[in-house]
A protein has these predicted regions:
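N-terminal intrinsically disordered, cationic/polar leader segments
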Residues: 1-36, 46, 50-113
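Short, conserved glycine- and acidic-residue-centered signature motifs
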Residues: 37-41
Length: 113
């Protein structure tokens, strides 16, 4: 199963501000190379990383594919509205996969930091 942890901060306005994410594990939906859930999650994560890097000036640290952690991303500076939109889009995509295929393949949890 893919385990996803989304890190969030509460704001004075009552909205959550997503400030990082860790994605690890394998869905186990199909054999390696044919697992559409793993492929979809990977595509979302890589596109998010590249989009933050290219379209924003926000500071971040990120790693992909090291040991059992497939993707680890944390903002290291104030989060711009553009980056927050990209993060919201990533979380929405992951939640849609979880809703469509079930928690036996991907589980998303939110952690206050």
């Amino acid at each position: 199963m893919i385990q996803t942890t989304v890190f969030k901060k509460s704001t004075d306005s009552g909205n959550d501000l997503y400030c990082g994410i860790v994605i690890k594990g394998h869905a186990g939906y199909a054999d390696e190379g044919e697992d559409i859930i793993c492929a979809a999650v990977s595509a979302l994560a890589i596109n998010f990383y590249n989009s933050v890097e290219i379209f924003t000036d926000d500071g971040f640290e990120g790693t992909a594919g090291q040991e059992d952690v497939q993707f680890d991303f944390r903002f290291t500076s104030d989060i711009s509205p553009e980056s927050q939109l990209l993060m919201n889009s990533l979380v929405l995509g992951l939640q849609n996969i979880e809703n469509d295929y079930g928690r036996s393949y991907i589980n998303i949890r939110f952690k206050e930091v």
